[in-house]
Amino acid sequence: MAEAPPRRLGLGPPPGDAPRAELVALTAVQSEQGEAGGGGSPRRLGLLGSPLPPGAPLPGPGSGSGSACGGQRSSAAQKRYRRLQNWVYNVLERPRGWAFVYHVFIFLLVFSCLVLSVLSTIQEHQELANECLLILEFVMIVVFGLEYIIRVWSAGCCCRYRGWQGRFRFARKPFCVIDFIVFVASVAVIAAGTQGNIFATSALRSMRFLQILRMVRMDRRGGTWKLLGSVVYAHSKELITAWYIGFLVLIFASFLVYLAEKDANSDFSSYADSLWWGTITLTTIGYGDKTPHTWLGRVLAAGFALLGISFFALPAGILGSGFALKVQEQHRQKHFEKRRMPAANLIQAAWRLYSTDTSRAYLTATWYYYDSILPSFRELALLFEHIQRARNGGLRPLEVRRAPVPDGAPSRYPPVATCHRPGSASFCPGESSRMGIKDRIRISSSQKRTGPSKQHLAPPPIPTSPSSEQVGEASSPSKVQKSWSFNDRTRFRASLRLKPRCSAEEGPSEEVAEEKSYQCELTVDDVMPAVKTVIRSVRILKFLVAKRKFKETLRPYDVKDVIEQYSAGHLDMLGRIKSLQARVDQIVGRGPGDRKTREKGDKGPSDTEAVDEISMMGRVVKVEKQVQSIEHKLDLLLGFYSRCLRSGTSASLGTVQVPLFDPDITSDYHSPVDHEDISVSAQTLSISRSVSTNMD
């Protein structure tokens, strides 16, 4: 029964459209799997695994419906809209690079309005300044009005400012409120000035100085105010102390000078006049409108001036030092932020070096990464084919094989195999199959497991491109079924494995003869270890470079960093010394004068013995006790033996009293022969000797 030829794709993608070709291939494979799994209608799935509706068209060039095309166009327009909105918001709220040009232009406009507002108060330049200011105000209204509207619109790129409620929340920000107030005041001034209203020359003229608020809006992000607030908050206790003492000095100085000068000096007729004098004097302004006349008042003023000025000047020094420390801290923070990228690169390089180890074959992410960036090996196959054509006199390998060769004529060059031998992954010139590194690793590992006999019987599956030529299985015995994987991102790229092309004219005997006679020169098993070695060497070099760059960023920034490094090293050294001391105490054993023993009190005998058994000194003492016990027992045995020798008779042997062995209570060693057993054996020996004597 002849097998049905493989189904071709109805919608072939163009050669240069790789993403759409991948989409078509995935859809076709899903449909084939659905037909093979169930006998009913195929159930097609999308790229994310969600089932497609039954009436959904097959994705391909020209096959999409009008609604789908309209949806794609609307999605693209939405992306462009969001991108433009985000770009405008960054230009207005977070300017960088050339965006500062616009903000400098706005600053010049605001500064020009401020200068003209000042000149409009001078009688000589009032008319010219008012005319120029009127024109500039029109320009400012247009610019600020458009900018305010664009700011509110571009705020929609942030999630919290989307929708009407989000826009209203953005409009309630302090700087937006200032912009709105200045805009309304400018419109009111221009409207009243153009109508020639007399009221505009009196009441609305003062509204022009609301333009001073425009200078506040120059710092949209409030960096200066945040810096000042952080410095004041960091040194709040010192500032409160200095201000409190200065205020007390001001009150006492003003009151005492008022008591001394109120009768003799009309300038100090009230306590308020004295407070004014004290404020001007202690702040070192010194207008000179009020001065003490009496000697008592002058002495008090001099004493309190020397004491109070120092406290009034303290906040300036505190704020100055705080600003200096804050700037230094910001520089240090920037220096530390420069370490993030080298540290991340070092971690990534270390992990990739770890994952490329040959003993960790289960880590495949790094191999997938290099599989996506490795160059195509199709040029290598073309180079082999070009060399063979040059050796064959300009003919292709198939033409050389089909050309008749006279009998007995020697061949100039050895023939080159052009067909794929089953069971071997080899490079043969022909049609290339697009196969990734992970598939080649899987095939090579399966070949090593199955062995040469099984490899010869069952050729490894080689995935082929759907857009390539499909040859029927009836005409091509070496046809290999398609093997697709949804995670295979490299199936449309040339690879190391090249598929041969065998014509139908060749017989089976010729194929077998060629398989037995010739072998391909380059195999995947030969190339893949070399590629892995090269990749691992590259990972080692990248790891060393990342390590060197990270060490360069660890250089100390200033003296404070050096002190911190020394203190950290000192703490580390103390910890190591403490650990070493604990180990020495454990080896030698803790004596009676140990500090912990004195602090926690005396331990029980069981605890002391347990501690002694752990320490080396306790073990040495235990061995010494056992040796003493053995020596004592040996002395007793030698004494018993010497008495037996001196008596010389068996009767004396029975009369000799065997000394009892006192077991050493302090020793853990006990002899397997007890002293009772020794006495019993001695009595048995004496009885046996007496019996033998009587028999004689």
From Swiss-Prot:
| Predominant subcellular localization, coarse grouping | membrane
Keywords of the record, alphabetical order, are: Cell membrane, Coiled coil, Hearing, Ion channel, Ion transport, Membrane, Potassium, Potassium channel, Potassium transport, Transmembrane, Transmembrane helix, Transport, Voltage-gated channel
Region annotated Interaction with CALM, chain positions: 343-352, 536-550
Show the SUPFAM superfamilies listed in the entry: Voltage-gated potassium channels
Query: Does this UniProt record's set of keywords contain Cell membrane?
Result: yes
| Comp. bias (Basic and acidic residues) | 592-606
Annotated stretches, region: C-terminal assembly domain (tetramerization): 547-651
Which Gene3D superfamilies does this UniProt record tie to the protein? 1.10.287.70, 6.10.140.1910
- Annotated catalysed reactions: K(+)(in) = K(+)(out)
GO MF terms held by the record? voltage-gated potassium channel activity
Q: Looking at the Swiss-Prot or TrEMBL record, what is one Pfam family this protein matches?
A: KCNQ_channel
Q: Name one GO cellular component term.
A: monoatomic ion channel complex
Outline which residue ranges sit on the Cytoplasmic face: 1-97, 154-169, 225-236, 324-696
**Where is this chain compositionally biased, Polar residues type?**
465-484
Question: Which InterPro entries has this protein been placed in?
Answer: Ion_trans_dom (IPR005821), K_chnl_volt-dep_KCNQ (IPR003937), K_chnl_volt-dep_KCNQ_C (IPR013821)
Q: In which tissues is it expressed?
A: In the inner ear expressed in the outer sensory hair cells of the cochlea and in type I hair cells of the vestibular organs. Also expressed in the postsynaptic membrane of the calyx nerve endings innervating type I cells. In the brain expressed in neurons of many, but not all, nuclei of the central auditory pathway. Absent from most other brain regions.
Q: Which ranges sit in the Extracellular compartment?
A: 120-130, 193-203, 260-271, 294
Q: What is known of its domains?
A: Each channel subunit contains six transmembrane segments (S1-S6) with S1-S4 forming one voltage sensing domain (VSD) and S5-S6 contributing to form one quarter of an interlocking pore-forming domain (PD). The CALM binding domains correspond to the first two membrane-proximal helical regions that interact with a single calmodulin/CALM molecule forming a clamp-like structure. CALM N-terminus binds to the second helix in both calcium-free and calcium-bound forms and regulates channel trafficking. CALM C-terminus binds to the first helice in calcium-free form; this interaction is disrupted by calcium binding which regulates channel electrophysiological activity.
Give the protein name, as stated in the record: Potassium voltage-gated channel subfamily KQT member 4
UniProt organism field: Mus musculus (Mouse)
